[in-house]
Amino acid sequence: MTMASVPKPDPQEAAKYFQQKLDCTTGPIELSHWIEEKASVQVVDVRAADDFEKGHIPGAVNVPRDQWAGAKGLSRDKTNVIYCYSQTCHLAAAAAVEFSKKGFSCIELEGGFITWQRASLPVTQTAGKA
């Protein structure tokens, strides 16, 4: 029987990594509080338009991948909270990289839309759609 190799990261490197993660991500409960408190955030859904229409975080703007070049709907004055489908979807991270390079302040909603739903937080549909 062989023993599994368990990583043992350098504590200083781990501290840097986790601080950067905290600086660049948020969870659904924290985001819901920011929305309630009218904090300086713009929620950005990077899922496909038809999925956005079926349900999204209230107040979110939809910027699907084919619209990233223009970054229409993002805010230069607020922190843009980017989300996609789930924890395994990397669209939000890819969008955050692209938007950050364009000068937008961005963080990622960890777990995406599915985590928001599982927390029983409000979901809205686009008027006249879905």
Where are these regions (language model features)?
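Short active-site oxyanion
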Residues: K38-V43, P58-G59, T79
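Short loop/helix-cap segments at secondary-structure boundaries that form the rim of catalytic
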Residues: F52-P58, A71-S75, W116
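Conserved beta-strand scaffold positions in the cores of enzyme catalytic domains, especially
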Residues: V43, A60-N62, C106-E108
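Short beta-strand/turn micro-motifs composed of small residues
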Residues: D45-R47, C84
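Catalytic cysteine-centered active loop of the rhodanese-like fold, especially the PTP/DSP P-loop
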Residues: L74-Q117
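Short low-complexity, flexible loop/linker segments enriched in glycine and/or proline
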Residues: A119-Q125
